[in-house]
From Swiss-Prot:
Gene3D superfamilies: 3.40.50.12280. Keywords: 4Fe-4S, Electron transport, Hydroxylation, Iron, Iron-sulfur, Membrane, Metal-binding, Mitochondrion, Mitochondrion inner membrane, NAD, Oxidoreductase, Respiratory chain, Transit peptide, Translocase, Transport, Ubiquinone. Its EC number is 7.1.1.2. It comes from Bos taurus. Belongs to the complex I 20 kDa subunit family. GO terms for cellular component: mitochondrial inner membrane; respiratory chain complex I. This is NADH dehydrogenase [ubiquinone] iron-sulfur protein 7, mitochondrial. The modification Hydroxyarginine is found at R114. Pfam families: Oxidored_q6. The keyword Transcription does not apply. Disulfide bonds: none annotated. HAMAP family: NDH1_NuoB. Residues 1-37 form a transit peptide. It is a peripheral membrane protein.
């Protein structure tokens, strides 16, 4: 009887201890989960406090902002008044003349052909470049003022074209002068050359000459 009475007295005590143990175990599990995966408020705070790197394209000072706007103004004026130097070497020159005709009217884009390299800022190499003509091409290119651009028109100017394996043909005018725009075709149409001129205007728009000079 005494043993039964003792068991009856121990039963509520054991129940309380088991409940406390279960509560402690659940609390430990929650604390470990919180340690493994932080709460949703912590990333927001850390992201808010994190320092976001500033892109290099954005101006970081007033002086750089003024230089950037001046750069945009100069690029706008430069791309709106391209003066190409005619360097017709083969049948591609006929399509280049076609682009200057009233049907396509390249003057509406500010493109005006000049006869002197000292008044030009664009050279359109139209046709097959031979080994004898290569020194003349380089000499004319060196006489053009900076900044200067080169448009390679046609397969022969791009890589030799039909005469790629000829002993007397340069396999691409980019071996003589740096080329900015390649216009494919044999010969390319006037629309293709006009599209190449528009791509050159987009390239000039993205230039950052003054900003690069200012950041030195």
């Amino acid at each position: 009887m005494a043993a039964l009475a003792a068991l009856r007295l121990l039963h509520p005590i054991l129940a309380v201890r088991s409940g406390v143990g279960a509560a402690l175990q659940v609390r430990g599990v929650h604390s470990s989960m919180a340690a493994d995966s932080p709460s949703s408020t912590q990333p927001a705070v850390s992201q808010a406090r994190a320092v976001v790197p500033k892109p290099a394209a954005l101006p970081s000072s007033r002086g750089e902002y003024v230089v950037a706007k001046l750069d945009d103004l100069i690029n706008w004026a430069r791309r709106s008044s391209l003066w190409p130097m005619t360097f017709g070497l083969a049948c591609c020159a006929v399509e280049m003349m076609h682009m200057a005709a009233p049907r396509y009217d390249m003057d509406r884009f500010g493109v005006v052909f000049r006869a002197s390299p000292r008044q030009s800022d664009v050279m359109i190499v139209a046709g097959t470049l031979t080994n004898k003509m290569a020194p003349a091409l380089r000499k004319v290119y060196d006489q053009m003022p900076e900044p200067r651009y080169v448009v390679s028109m046609g397969s022969c100017a791009n890589g030799g074209g039909y005469y790629h394996y000829s002993y007397s043909v340069v396999r691409g005018c980019d071996r003589i002068v740096p080329v900015d725009i390649y216009v494919p075709g044999c010969p390319p149409t006037a629309e293709a050359l006009l599209y190449g001129i528009l791509q050159l205007q987009k390239k000039i728009k993205r230039e950052k000459r003054l900003r690069i000079w200012y950041r030195r």
